[in-house]
From Swiss-Prot:
UniProt xrefs under SMART domains: S1
Species in which this protein is naturally found: Staphylococcus aureus (strain COL)
CDD domains: S1_RPS1_repeat_ec1_hs1, S1_RPS1_repeat_ec2_hs2, S1_RPS1_repeat_ec3
The protein's name in its UniProt record: Small ribosomal subunit protein bS1
Entry function: Binds mRNA; thus facilitating recognition of the initiation point. It is needed to translate mRNA with a short Shine-Dalgarno (SD) purine-rich sequence.
Amino acid sequence: MTEEFNESMINDIKEGDKVTGEVQQVEDKQVVVHINGGKFNGIIPISQLSTHHIDSPSEVVKEGDEVEAYVTKVEFDEENETGAYILSRRQLETEKSYSYLQEKLDNNEIIEAKVTEVVKGGLVVDVGQRGFVPASLISTDFIEDFSVFDGQTIRIKVEELDPENNRVILSRKAVEQEENDAKKDQLLQSLNEGDVIDGKVARLTQFGAFIDIGGVDGLVHVSELSHEHVQTPEEVVSIGQDVKVKIKSIDRDTERISLSIKDTLPTPFENIKGQFHENDVIEGVVVRLANFGAFVEIAPGVQGLVHISEIAHKHIGTPGEVLEPGQQVNVKILGIDEENERVSLSIKATLPNEDVVESDPSTTKAYLENEEEDNPTIGDMIGDKLKNLKL
């Protein structure tokens, strides 16, 4: 055989060429391929058949299959005038996979892949080659046991590609975050001030409780937890508790939502409707003194005013002459204004007096109708509560 003929036999196909052929024989550790246009058969070692680990070539090919591969080496035996092309199907699959993944990365697209293995540091997935989802990129939530993903097909995004080091990093967390953001935006657009909705207590702080209302957290300030004075949120709610809340305000730009639990609850006054009536004599506790009278709590959260003229039969200059906060007293209900939630009381009417003088109806009428010049303001009525309130 001449040197020219030998060169013609081996130079038609060279290393790096991409070739196609038909599988002629499947052996234990390799596959024999008839190369289209080639002078020799091709050999694909088992390690170069797939990007995945296989125990037998028959797992991925069979006789008669058409395959495509790169030529990694041309072997020629001059003495016997025989040769073979050493091929890599794996190299071609990897190249195609990187090209596909690069396109998805450039376009920020979501792909689906099956989890083939769960390891200590994350998830191994099949993306045409071995891809890895690190533990930190699996979810926006804490997941204690990654084995729940074993065998599942998950939605992921390409985070990083490094072909030189055969490195493919993927993120399931990025997909979750994108979906959560879309849900949050949709929810924010659907909410309106005044809506009463269900929520769950997510976390507590010194100044209030954050409520999960379906993917978005809103704040219930400590002053909006109850009609009664609350020192700390833990007195009223606990993490994980289901609650009803009313939307007080929404700032869609900053995604800040102000909520109220108090506004969904009956007021203390509503709770006592039908319990008290005019002319009833009941017990109460003096909670605050003002220059025009004394505020007496007759039920939890319900206070009535004893005008200074209704404190004693004798003339007094200030309520403090005969009363002090915390003092228990008997009071007579002079009037109830349900619409404005006001109660007019009298201590004098419960006290014996030789010269009994009927309570002045004009005093009661003025308080209930808010006509007296020195009638208490909202600040007068809840001043102590505001002083004690920790913001």
